[in-house]
Amino acid sequence: MPVFDANGIPLYYEEAGSGEPVVLVHGALCDHTVWKPQVDVLSAKYRTIAYSRRYAHPNNREGDLMDSTVQNNAEDLAALIDGLGLEKVHLVGHSYGGFIAAFFALKHPDKARSLTLANAAVVTMLVARPGATASISLLFRSPSVALSARNLINATNDTVKAVDGGDATAAFRIFVPALSNHRTDLPQKPPSFEAMVTRNARTLRETTAPFPPVTKSEVRGIKAPTLVLWGALSAPWDYKVSQLLAQVIPGARAVVVPGTGHFFFLENVVMANEKMLEFLEALDHN
């Protein structure tokens, strides 16, 4: 079992294929297995590396999730890239992993060949300075975004409380539906999805750790060629964050995947993989 020691933090990883390296960064409640549909396709042309972030299955899960911050995960990623002898990598990040990938690209621009942000949860872009005043301002500017963000916060708190009480299934029952405002018309995810979310339920607590104050002005500093993808049926806060990323990052390409939500890359695998490959192959020809 390949495990890399990132400054004392064990990170399990799997790789397939050869060529330019592509590193896949998963979100909360997930692990490296969430990327299997992408690894199967990308590895035909690229050295594709999917790893489990700190405390995600099958890593040691007994640590303090409050130290699984965006900043610490970005440094774990830097250590993994260096440890595998890589120089520049194509980064693909989803949700909390998308925030990590974007933050990494800002802090380690020399290591980011490109950036693919999949429903990246860079929520700090919604308000310049988090707090009551900013929340009220957001409510007046965009009520649906503010209310959906509040729904997500409530779902997060309810889920963390339930998981702490021993109910790991709460992550799938309470939190996942809240990502798309409890929509019931989304395509089915793989049968393995519920099991993955349940075994990683405890990791949701990492999203309650303080976020780095990454604003729109800072995001403009991303230099790597960037593809921003998101599901058309994502919750309003989620949709808005991806829109902002696509608008603010210089030269970013934007793709909205119809009929899908927060996990669009599992709900429409064919289109998601097609758009990722198109983006990467275009860079190969530049």
Label each residue range with its predicted role.
Residues 24-27, 53, 95, 120, ...:
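Glycine-rich His-Gly loop
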Residues 5, 9-66, 80:
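Conserved HGGG/HGGXW glycine-rich cap/lid loop of the alpha/beta-hydrolase fold
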Residues 106, 113-159:
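Flexible "cap/lid" loop of the alpha/beta hydrolase fold
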Residues 40, 49-96, 107, 274:
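Active-site loop/oxyanion-hole signature of alpha/beta-hydrolase fold enzymes
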Residues 186-247:
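Conserved serine/cysteine hydrolase catalytic core
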Residues 251-286:
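Catalytic active-site module of serine/aspartate enzymes centered on a nucleophile-bearing elbow/loop
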Residues 100-104:
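Hydrolases whose catalytic domains are alpha/beta-hydrolase-1, hotdog thioesterase
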Residues 150-205:
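Conserved alpha/beta-hydrolase catalytic His-Asp/Glu region
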